[in-house]
Amino acid sequence: MSANRLYLYDSTLRDGQQTQGVDFTVGDKIAIAHELDAIGIDYVEGGWPGANPTDDAFFAAAPALRRARLSAFGMTRRPGRRPEEDAGLMRILDSGAPVVCMVGKTWDFHVEIALRSTLAENLEMIADSIAFARGRVAEVMFDAEHFFDGYKANPDFALRCIEAALNAGARWAVLCDTNGGSLPHEVEAITREVAARFPGERLGIHCHDDTGNAVANSLAAVRSGIRQVQGTLNGLGERCGNANLVSLLPTLMLKMGYETGLSREDLRQLTHVSRVVDERLNRAHDRHAPYVGENAFAHKGGLHVSAVEKDARSYEHVHPEDVGNTRKILVSDQAGRSNVLSLLREVGLVIEANDPRVDRLVRLVKEREFIGYTYDGAEASFELLARQELEQLTPPFELVSYRVTDERRMTETGVPFTLAEATMKVRVDGEMHMTVAEGNGPVNALDRALRKALLTAYPALVDMHLVDYKVRILGSGAGTDALIRVMIESTDGSGRRWTTVGVSSNVIEASWQALSDAVAYKLHA
């Protein structure tokens, strides 16, 4: 084994499921396991057999993995029982997984208070369970629960637990910062002492993020000689989460030069994998996530953009393509000519740098942002505005008028509900269309009325739908007198997403602006 080789253990499907609001289906777990396998993760922890029906169903229909090894998680035997008499231990050994990861106590406080056992029996539980498992599965790991707290309290006992596991045949002994309270300098010092006594190529690290240091603690452990790193995709996990493998992977490979099971080509799938997990969970992707966030390589200030255009290294620590991400130039009231020119080129608008229309467009953007518009994140509205100013846009339709009414009604059983109705007149290719549509709210009614008017002329609208709608009150206006900004995110059958913006003191008018821009962008693109 190369001294520079690290082994990656993903526990998204078990630890990640302990995140508040996360509830994987069996299909979710199988799909995510295949994504992890495809990029070259060494171990995929599928769950805890016997803990819940989902995990049982997952192992019963375990996916065939090409590159990763499937691991089942569980506990060492209970006090006072032999391994073969412990139903929980037998469930993980009978799960069919080639690897099992057993958690056991290494903090004397936990042994005496939580287990109501003795330190001597705890050592026997670790050794008995691992030795028994070694005869039944290909590989056994030991998760040393609360190791860092245990080491601080009683280093001799904590180390004897690691020794018992390794001597019994564990391939890896994983040092766990279970409470997430250790700091990087503590982790580095303690793991260096452990690695001086036991081979680093048999030691792992498992960190929680309760102090915001899970990634830093994992890196500190690697610097001290540990060679297995555990974590989860997007930092999922109970309480504050686990070490984020999505941040760790590129740091270990691109910054620290370690070898992993991933090739550089595999690493280019990282952004995709991160977003697949959020899509599966119906969660918004963290725009500010290191490496893979939408804003990880976003540039807003004009001086920054000008420098990036000359050499991306001036404001980017790695190439976005190396992790499957893309550079993003933002337009805002801080933007200069560099931002605008870069964005115009990106959308295929060719214009000379000294063209006076560029200055006019910059001024227009700043004026509109002053009254509440934002094109930082609403690039579709910016492109429409730019094409209009450059006289390169023919509006696909013209609004003549709209009227929206909201009516509160009662069901036959006396339950109140509201129904919105929109009446709209639009002109398409010189021909007037008047439509009426109902919706569960005014924006939904407007959307339906507009589609109804346009579908005959523009059948491509059939696969477009809105996926997000945000309202924000702007400025110092008092309550209902304030300006309102609406952002709408849309998508279509191709998977493209785009965001548009509208601003008004009337929420329906602001919504109309964002909605009409969304439709116009779809028809133009």
Where do the language-model regions lie?
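Catalytic alpha/beta core domains of metabolic enzymes, predominantly
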Residues: 179-182, 189-310, 314
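A glycine-rich helix N-cap at a beta->alpha junction
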Residues: 69-74
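Short beta-alpha connecting loops at secondary-structure transitions
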Residues: 175-178, 230-238, 253-263, 322-330, ...
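Mixed-charge, glycine-accented linear interaction segment located at domain edges/termini
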Residues: 495-525
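A mid-to-C-terminal "edge-of-domain" accessory segment
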Residues: 5-6, 12, 250, 256-431, ...
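A short, contiguous, amphipathic alpha-helix enriched in charged residues
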Residues: 440-461
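Alpha/beta enzyme core
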Residues: 6-8, 14-44, 57-65, 78-201, ...
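Generic long, charged, amphipathic alpha-helical segments
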Residues: 457-492
